[in-house]
């Protein structure tokens, strides 16, 4: 008799995606981060839902409602700390997942990769509107500065900014709509995740060699479901440790002060996971140029599949491009550091050089090394 999971209309979908899914036998721990992102998303939705039960999206009570959650609600402090630090862990997993995709050439599955880039943009947008909700100093000024960037759009810019604000400045209407977006977007992310998986299961997973693995595949369960469970355990332990022991490690002290439109913080900066893009934005003195560079810093990922020059998919057997890849990682770390520094010498110059290197690596250096490696191996693209 055929198992129910193989015949039932709903269980059949879950079975083909999570149980009987043919998976390359040699995928490493770098492939764990997709499922970890699913765990992060589920955790953020659950903790966010409990926070939304007690939060009020009104500028006169928003800050107080967050204080009330932490002081008076049963385990409210824990839910809030898990949610705030969960966002950081979400981005750690997200950037690692993208890094793995770049290293092993997963971007050659163009549909999956494009949906992934959309997911990245949606997650960044969700995190940005979420950061505004506690209505602290950095929340208010971050919202003001980032939304103001849209005024650089010729002709329609100023109108667009006021339309987003719902008035002539960041005010009550802005907070209310940001809360609405922050509540809605995670469900949009969940829907796009389903599309992401749909496209992935059309082609099957890549593997560390970058070679076809059809001849050597094993069922996802129990092998990789158990392997993912280990990843879940490590992530949950690390997240709870941070939430319980150093909950404010990754936050900004300015956000413990209620928003005041009359007092500007000495250094306006976003959360750590946006600092690399913020450094690129600041490295261009022109407002419109900076906004375009900021957009390009993320959207450049969408161009990667079209810049492939090597005949090999992964970087596993490509030492020259490996060196360039790790240079890119170091460069992003430098940009993250610069993004948190004041706008003064030598940080401005370092930021400009690092921004130039960032785009050069993607657009010029990696395609060149790919071509060079093929030449060295006397391979010609067919």
Curated annotation (Swiss-Prot):
It is a multi-pass membrane protein. The chain crosses the membrane at residues 33-53, 77-98, 113-133, 178-198, 226-246, 288-308, 320-340, 347-367. GO terms for molecular function: metal ion binding; ubiquinol-cytochrome-c reductase activity. The keyword Hydrolase does not apply. Belongs to the cytochrome b family. The cytochrome bc1 complex contains 3 respiratory subunits (MT-CYB, CYC1 and UQCRFS1), 2 core proteins (UQCRC1 and UQCRC2) and probably 6 low-molecular weight proteins. This is Cytochrome b. It comes from Sigmops gracilis (Slender fangjaw).
